[in-house]
């Protein structure tokens, strides 16, 4: 008979390691599993210690959060361990985050943290402790497939779904992971936390970029990659200089505010050129992309990636965490993988993830994904160039 974690055996005979960040989600996960009778062990990773960030609302895995996780563990009566992963986190997440921004990308550090730290190192530690599974407080689900392996599926609460950040999870990792909150809403989680008497029941949610003390990511990038703060030109699609900026790190594709340029029509950041330090801007129409070239593709669908793609695989893709999946085709071209967006997308930014799904809504299955290497517009976007010609600047400014 299978228990609530889809495992053979009684809960009391099943050890579960819970990744406890100190927030309400992971704390409720630990309390819920303990209440169901599992042998629960809590582990918190100390990922950074940046002074101001320790007490900042929305920080994660710093001093106050470690204290909160320990308090919850004592409340529910489970052993709790803190592992120092600052060095690993700095190398795998913070350094790569800064490098990505310096090369004109807009990275998603949570994906790298899950891939390199939580679902690799912590998973190994859980196995060493004799755990049957590692449970987390992510809003996502998994289900058993006919062959006994597991599929990653979206959370029941679409507004809280975190599947975008977990696309890089491997099949082996999925078999060992469990997500008890996948069928809950956030209000239900908080209510459950209150019923367990957890002090974190009303604690603020953590921020995506948890390691940025001031909330200004450019401070972190500027310290690690000073060249990203070097000034350069803001130009239109024809290369005409419209203004100056103080570092490409201050910009991302699709950005409209803070350009420091007055024009007859709104201008948007279309691309960043780190080699020339140019920020290319233009009309919204020029943001529309329909082809995306991917790197570091991870496949967790059926069969192998090459076999699944064949001459082309119809699917749905999400190019930013806040957007709904859109219809697309995945193709293998000259040894690389390319996504063709049927309706196109605005603001497709290199460094972001393009995540694959088998359906546009509901508890769709996650098929994998990759990081956006580059994007191309429809037919060179001649119409957008025409619109750009009409946007004669009224004054040039400096982006600070």
UniProtKB/Swiss-Prot annotation:
One GO cellular component term noted in the UniProt record for this chain: cytoplasm
Record-level Gene Ontology MF annotations: ATP binding; tRNA binding; tRNA-uridine 2-sulfurtransferase activity
Disulfide bonds: 113-210
Enzyme Commission number(s) from the entry: 2.8.1.13
A GO BP annotation: tRNA wobble position uridine thiolation
Residues under site feature: Interaction with tRNA: 138, 352
Reaction it catalyzes: S-sulfanyl-L-cysteinyl-[protein] + uridine(34) in tRNA + AH2 + ATP = 2-thiouridine(34) in tRNA + L-cysteinyl-[protein] + A + AMP + diphosphate + H(+)
Segments for region (Interaction with tRNA): 160-162
Keywords, in A-Z order: ATP-binding, Cytoplasm, Disulfide bond, Nucleotide-binding, RNA-binding, Transferase, tRNA processing, tRNA-binding
CDD domains: MnmA_TRMU-like
Primary location recorded for the protein, binned into one broad class: cytoplasm
Ligand binding (ATP): 19-26, 45, 137
Location in or out of the cell: Cytoplasm
Active site: 113 (nucleophile), 210 (cysteine persulfide intermediate)
Cross-referenced Pfam families: tRNA_Me_trans, tRNA_Me_trans_C, tRNA_Me_trans_M
Known role: Catalyzes the 2-thiolation of uridine at the wobble position (U34) of tRNA, leading to the formation of s(2)U34.
Family: Belongs to the MnmA/TRMU family.
PANTHER family to which the protein is assigned, alphabetical: MITOCHONDRIAL TRNA-SPECIFIC 2-THIOURIDYLASE 1 (PTHR11933:SF5), TRNA 5-METHYLAMINOMETHYL-2-THIOURIDYLATE -METHYLTRANSFERASE (PTHR11933)
Protein name: tRNA-specific 2-thiouridylase MnmA
Organism: Rhodopseudomonas palustris (strain BisA53)
Classification lineage: Bacteria, Pseudomonadati, Pseudomonadota, Alphaproteobacteria, Hyphomicrobiales
């Amino acid at each position: 008979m299978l228990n609530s974690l889809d495992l053979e055996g009684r809960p009391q005979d099943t050890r579960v390691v819970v990744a406890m960040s100190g927030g309400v989600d992971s704390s409720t996960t630990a309390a819920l599993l303990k209440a169901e009778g599992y042998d629960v062990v809590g582990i918190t990773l100390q990922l950074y210690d940046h002074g101001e960030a320790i007490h900042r609302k929305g920080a994660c895995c710093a001093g106050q959060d470690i204290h909160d996780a320990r308090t919850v563990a004592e409340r529910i009566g489970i052993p709790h361990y803190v592992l120092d992963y600052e060095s690993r986190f700095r190398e795998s997440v913070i350094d790569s985050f800064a490098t990505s921004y310096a090369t004109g990308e807009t990275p998603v550090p949570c994906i790298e943290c899950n891939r390199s730290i939580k679902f690799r190192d912590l998973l190994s530690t859980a196995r060493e402790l004799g755990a049957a599974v590692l449970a987390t407080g992510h809003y996502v689900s998994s289900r058993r497939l006919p062959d006994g392996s597991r599929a990653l599926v979206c959370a029941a609460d679409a507004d809280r779904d975190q599947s975008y950040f977990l696309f890089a999870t491997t099949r082996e990792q999925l078999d060992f992971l469990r997500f008890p909150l996948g069928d809950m809403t956030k209000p239900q989680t908080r209510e459950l936390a209150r019923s367990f008497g957890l002090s974190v029941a009303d604690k603020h949610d953590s921020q995506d970029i948890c390691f940025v003390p001031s909330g200004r990511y450019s401070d972190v990038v500027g310290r690690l990659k000073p060249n990203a703060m070097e000034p350069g030109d803001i130009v239109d699609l024809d290369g005409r200089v419209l203004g100056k900026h103080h570092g490409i790190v201050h910009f991302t594709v699709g950005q409209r505010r803070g350009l420091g340029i007055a024009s007859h029509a709104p201008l948007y950041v279309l691309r960043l050129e780190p080699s020339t330090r140019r920020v290319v801007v233009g009309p919204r129409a020029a943001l529309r992309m329909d082809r995306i070239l991917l790197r570091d593709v991870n496949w967790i669908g059926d069969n192998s990636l090459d076999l699944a793609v064949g001459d082309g695989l119809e699917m749905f893709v999400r190019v930013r965490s806040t957007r709904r999946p859109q219809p697309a085709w995945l193709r293998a071209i000259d040894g690389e993988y390319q996504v063709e967006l049927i309706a196109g997308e605005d603001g497709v930014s290199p460094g972001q993830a393009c995540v694959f799904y088998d359906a546009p809504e509901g508890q769709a299955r996650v098929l994998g994904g990759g990081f956006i290497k580059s994007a191309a517009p429809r037919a060179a976007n001649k119409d957008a160039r025409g619109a750009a010609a009409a946007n004669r600047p009224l004054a040039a400014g400096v982006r600070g």
